[in-house]
Amino acid sequence: MATFSQKPTEVVKKWVIIDAENLVLGRLAAFVANRLRGKHKATFTPHVDDGDNVIVINADKIALTGKKYTDKKYYWHTGYIGGIKERTARQLLEGRFPERVVEKAVERMIPRGPLGRRQLKNLRVYAGSQHPHEAQQPESLDVGALNRKNKRIA
């Protein structure tokens, strides 16, 4: 029997919604990254985008363990000499776009390259509980119930 290799025309993508309230950031990001890549499917093929469309709501209510809320730093470079910048997770979560913490965590768990960029476009993260994807009828997934370590009650 030959090894199964899925073709891009055979891919069936589902819509999944995840409520991130009180979920641990790294555990949520790992789960979402696997869903985006399609590794949860028996038809997983490394060079084909067969992952699901994932919607994450309440990204501003994510939980960080230990002292990461105040100590974790996000770095970027402006492109100018000496232009390294940093912000803490607290500054990002209390700032204008708190959903970027979840986006960055998932982005860094997906392989870099053209396929990874295409898979990352299937991720939609919203700070609040409202989202414009009701027409897709997303299936709700309770990540907190999968493992007791996935959820933190603050």
UniProtKB/Swiss-Prot annotation:
Which InterPro entries would you find in this protein's record? Answer: Ribosomal_uL13, Ribosomal_uL13_bac-type, Ribosomal_uL13_sf
UniProt keywords, alphabetically? Ribonucleoprotein, Ribosomal protein
Listed under GO cellular component are: cytosolic large ribosomal subunit
Where would you find the membrane-spanning parts of this chain? none
- Kindly indicate whether the keyword Ribonucleoprotein belongs to this entry: yes
- Residue ranges of coiled coil: none
Q: Which SUPFAM superfamilies match?
A: Ribosomal protein L13
Which GO molecular function, any one, fits this protein according to its record? mRNA binding
| HAMAP family listed in its UniProt record | Ribosomal_uL13 (MF_01366)
Family per similarity comment: Belongs to the universal ribosomal protein uL13 family.
Q: What does this chain do?
A: This protein is one of the early assembly proteins of the 50S ribosomal subunit, although it is not seen to bind rRNA by itself. It is important during the early stages of 50S assembly.
Q: What is this protein called?
A: Large ribosomal subunit protein uL13
Q: Which gene encodes it?
A: rplM
